[in-house]
């Protein structure tokens, strides 16, 4: 699959990262210009890390499934040294080089990408799901297992039934949604990446839940694959 070269990865400082984020955030579109029934392939993306000596390495895994049957269509992965230091709010700059390399290995072109992480639910609205969207030129969704507290705002827990949700509102703006995908099970944190609205994100996530996990199967399978690959590589 081809990607769009939005920017290089020579930047290494917080100030440079902020400039890039500020230029991209203006291009976020939280609307869906597609119909859910037109989705054929959906991809889950996850990364895992390990340290060897004084160096840190990462592996990115992408699992492509048939949106309607759940059948695994394709798997791809890539790994390498992580050269960008961790800085809160700028995680995408560490992860994107590996994500892009892995996407380029795909023989199939997914209609939707779902990331194990955040999108619009981010200090600068530029979580990995949002930042990656500009390179992928595809709708993206962020699905997080834990809550990223922005501006000191806590989330409100939804009711205990399956499908219950509460929007995450910060400074009168909806950043994402707390979604309970299974009765009496911890919720997940869903946010738009780009080129999609929150209602559609919720429908897609809910459709892709099975008996094995509270996570959509795309994200769950990608998570399992990254742990497997990390064990093999580290």
Swiss-Prot record:
Q: Is NADP tagged as a keyword?
A: no
Organism source for this protein? Answer: Clostridium acetobutylicum (strain ATCC 824 / DSM 792 / JCM 1419 / IAM 19013 / LMG 5710 / NBRC 13948 / NRRL B-527 / VKM B-1787 / 2291 / W)
Protein name listed in UniProt = Endonuclease V
Molecular function in Gene Ontology: deoxyribonuclease V activity; magnesium ion binding; RNA endonuclease activity, producing 5'-phosphomonoesters; single-stranded RNA binding
Q: What class of enzyme is it?
A: hydrolase
Record flagged with keyword Hydrolase: yes
Q: Which gene encodes it?
A: nfi
* Binding-site residues for Mg(2+), renumbered to this chain: 46, 116
- Name what cofactor the protein needs: Mg(2+)
Q: What keywords sit in the KW lines?
A: Cytoplasm, DNA damage, DNA repair, Endonuclease, Hydrolase, Magnesium, Metal-binding, Nuclease
CDD domains per the record? Answer: Endonuclease_V (cd06559)
Provide the reaction this enzyme catalyses.
Endonucleolytic cleavage at apurinic or apyrimidinic sites to products with a 5'-phosphate
Q: Name one Pfam family in it.
A: Endonuclease_5
Enzyme Commission number(s):
3.1.21.7
What is the recorded function of this protein according to its Swiss-Prot or TrEMBL entry? DNA repair enzyme involved in the repair of deaminated bases. Selectively cleaves double-stranded DNA at the second phosphodiester bond 3' to a deoxyinosine leaving behind the intact lesion on the nicked DNA.
Q: Could you say which residues are annotated as the site Interaction with target DNA?
A: 86
In the UniProt record, which is one GO cellular component term? cytoplasm
Q: Which superkingdom is the protein from?
A: Bacteria
